[in-house]
């Protein structure tokens, strides 16, 4: 599935999953899990595009070109299904922007999985990426 089809809906959903974000930050003690820095982004272990693809296929959601093409009831329905599906997966992890960019440069921007994350976390912890990020993280 072409991930660009989901851009409008993805932006809407990302702006409306505050509880998941709060829970993810709390789970990471409000800091990057690698550096302890308080400046971080939240990485979805099971990507937003994966969840959107799942709910589009399983619930026969019609993808519209613009978020304004959905009714409030449709958006509420989609968001509730998304939150339900998202709860099946691990919370997000808090990581520095530079580390987040590194992950996606290695594994792509869309359709990421927990398995990719666990491999990245292992490699990061083992120093595999030290040379790449040496000058990017203070």
Predicted regions and their residues:
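A boundary/linker detector
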Residues: 1-39, 125-138
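Generic serine detector
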Residues: 3, 8-10, 24, 49, ...
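Generic hydrophobic, helix-prone segments enriched in Leu/Val/Ile
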Residues: 4, 9-17, 48-52, 56, ...
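Short cysteine-rich loop/turn motifs with clustered Cys
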Residues: 16-67, 98
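Residue-identity detector for glutamine
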Residues: 18-19, 31, 41, 86, ...
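Short Cys/His-centered divalent metal-binding micro-motifs
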Residues: 64-114
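Active-site or metal-binding loop neighborhoods of secreted/extracellular toxin and effector enzymes
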Residues: 102-138
């Amino acid at each position: 599935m072409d991930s660009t089809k989901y851009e409008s809906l993805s932006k809407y959903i990302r702006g409306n999953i505050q509880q998941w974000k709060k829970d993810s930050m709390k789970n990471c003690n409000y800091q990057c899990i690698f550096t302890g820095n308080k400046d971080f982004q939240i990485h979805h272990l099971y990507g937003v595009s994966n969840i959107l693809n799942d709910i589009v296929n399983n619930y026969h959601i019609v993808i519209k070109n613009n978020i304004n093409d959905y009714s409030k009831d449709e958006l509420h329905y989609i968001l509730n299904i998304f939150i339900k599906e998202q709860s099946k997966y691990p919370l997000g992890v808090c990581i520095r922007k530079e580390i987040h960019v590194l992950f996606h440069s290695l594994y792509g921007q869309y359709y990421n999985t927990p398995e990719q994350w666990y491999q990245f976390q292992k490699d990061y912890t083992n120093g595999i990426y030290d040379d790449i990020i040496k000058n990017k993280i203070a």
